Curated annotation (Swiss-Prot):
Uses, biotech or industry: Notoamides have been shown to exhibit antitumoral activities. Notoamides A-C show moderate cytotoxicity against HeLa and L1210 cells with IC(50) values in the range of 22-52 mg/ml, but the IC(50) value of notoamide D is greater than 100 mg/ml. Moreover, notoamide C induces G2/M-cell cycle arrest at a concentration of 6.3 mg/ml.
PANTHER family xref list: BAEYER-VILLIGER OXIDASE MDPL (PTHR35870:SF7), PROTEIN, PUTATIVE (AFU_ORTHOLOGUE AFUA_5G03330)-RELATED (PTHR35870)
Protein's job: Baeyer-Villiger oxidase; part of the gene cluster that mediates the biosynthesis of notoamide, a fungal indole alkaloid that belongs to a family of natural products containing a characteristic bicyclo[2.2.2]diazaoctane core. The first step of notoamide biosynthesis involves coupling of L-proline and L-tryptophan by the bimodular NRPS notE, to produce cyclo-L-tryptophan-L-proline called brevianamide F.
Keywords: Oxidoreductase
Name recorded for this polypeptide: Baeyer-Villiger oxidase notM
Highest taxon in the source lineage: Eukaryota
Pfam family, one: Questin_oxidase
Organism taxonomic ancestry: Eukaryota, Fungi, Dikarya, Ascomycota, Pezizomycotina
Molecular-function GO terms, alphabetical: oxidoreductase activity
Family, as annotated: Belongs to the questin oxidase family.
Gene from which the chain derives: notM
């Protein structure tokens, strides 16, 4: 069997993505390989120096997993490549490609992310930097078993400014392990972030892309650490804890959850590291919730939503509609993550502890419809999404839902 080099893209029918509903047409995998290889060989991982991540791989792979064909894949690529920068001289990407070629991608991830050496600890934290982009990218690479995309994700992590999240993670973990704070359901911790004056007011619109670093991690570090440390997963509850994190991410509608579903299924990753992956993701979600103004979470806003463009659509129809939207991949990632969340969360939505899972039943589809209805028009992401849902200023361009 030919071993795939870390500079090559070669998708196969054996790995075509989570939350898939329909098969892809003939020729889809071949075109996806061509587009992803072109992106890998031609474009910078950042289209601007701060807060500008290349989303082409995310978009193409999401559309592929959602059953899109050549037309939809070309749309996804064309919507993303026009503003990309050419590749510069590379260090991190070439380093991780050579390491993967020599050792294999699983061994490289074990060494550089999970070995608990000082370097691995720094890299593990860095996976969550840049609004989660490195771990999202890594998740795509593992999901589709593509060493080239795994190398890109590791290079993403290695090249990001830490932004003080390493201090936040380590302090939260130390406090959780001390036994001095009780474990609480994640949905209650979101409520605590909003009730606490310091965490609720720590974020500032004017902090821009540094809203987390200069917001809760600067103005309310002690408070957000204390709250975040209370999300704790027992070894026997990893599946439930993952579902709880995904459910609350959907409730807040601000954090993508897909990589967790991929990573917790990797038996070659030690159980304690898989638990850590989910705990850190949920804790960072709480910090980002504070950074974005801790908007009031009201279930009635979801259950009472009346779909517009998506009225009457079920998941199959919604997938098809999303694949045709001009976008850089955010709405496709969002909708696929919700469909995956529906599946992962379902076993825990009834019975003991069900209150920890606010999103239930058809609310998963309803949130996906909200996402599609409000982002289907236009190209500019600044007009598609509310950047800071807890700030009144961020809603000025948005019509009242009532």
């Amino acid at each position: 069997m030919t071993i795939l080099k870390a500079s090559q893209v070669k998708l196969t029918a054996r790995r075509t993505g989570l939350a898939r509903l329909d098969p892809s047409p003939t020729g889809t995998l071949e075109l996806a390989n061509e587009l992803l290889q072109r992106n890998h060989d031609s474009y910078h991982m950042y289209f601007r120096d701060v807060g500008g991540h290349n989303h082409i791989a995310h978009s193409v792979l999401s559309v592929l997993a959602m059953g899109g064909g050549p037309k939809e894949l070309n749309r996804a690529y064309d919507d993303g490549y026009g503003y990309q920068r050419p590749l510069p001289a590379l260090n991190f990407l070439h380093f991780f490609e050579s390491e993967i070629d020599a050792k294999g991608w699983q061994a490289v991830l074990q060494e550089y992310c999970f070995s608990r050496t000082p370097l691995a600890e720094a890299m593990f934290s860095q996976l969550y930097e840049g609004l989660l982009h490195p771990i999202i990218h890594l998740g795509f690479g593992i999901e589709f078993e593509q060493p080239s995309i795994i190398a890109e994700g590791l290079a993403h992590a290695a090249s990001h400014d830490p932004g003080n999240i390493d201090t936040f993670f380590l302090r939260s973990e130390e406090l959780a392990r001390s036994g001095s704070v009780p474990a609480k359901p994640l949905v209650e911790l979101y409520e605590e972030v909003r009730r606490n004056e310091k965490t609720r007011t720590a974020g500032r619109m004017q902090d821009g892309p540094f809203r987390l670093r200069d917001g809760p991690l600067a103005r309310s570090m002690d408070e957000i650490v204390h709250i975040a440390a209370q999300f704790q997963i027992k070894p026997e509850d990893l599946e439930r804890g993952t579902a709880e994190m995904i459910n609350c991410a959907a409730y807040s509608a601000g954090r993508r959850s897909g990589p967790a579903s991929v990573l917790v299924k990797q038996s070659w990753i030690k159980l304690e590291d898989r638990i850590r992956l989910v705990e850190w993701k949920a804790r960072l979600d709480l910090a980002w919730y504070a950074a974005n103004g801790a908007a009031e979470l009201r279930l009635e806003d979801i259950s009472g939503y009346e779909p517009t463009a998506s009225k009457g659509m079920e998941w199959h129809a919604l997938y098809k509609a999303v694949n045709e939207v001009h976008d850089d991949g955010h709405i496709a990632k969002f909708v696929r993550a919700l469909k995956n969340g529906e599946t992962v969360s379902a076993p825990f939505e009834q019975g003991d502890g069900a209150d920890a899972f606010p999103i239930k039943g058809d609310l998963w589809l309803r949130i996906a419809q909200m996402g599609y209805d409000t982002t289907k028009d236009g190209h500019d992401n600044s007009d598609k999404w509310v950047w800071g849902a807890g700030f009144d200023l961020a809603w000025m361009k948005v019509p009242d839902s009532q």
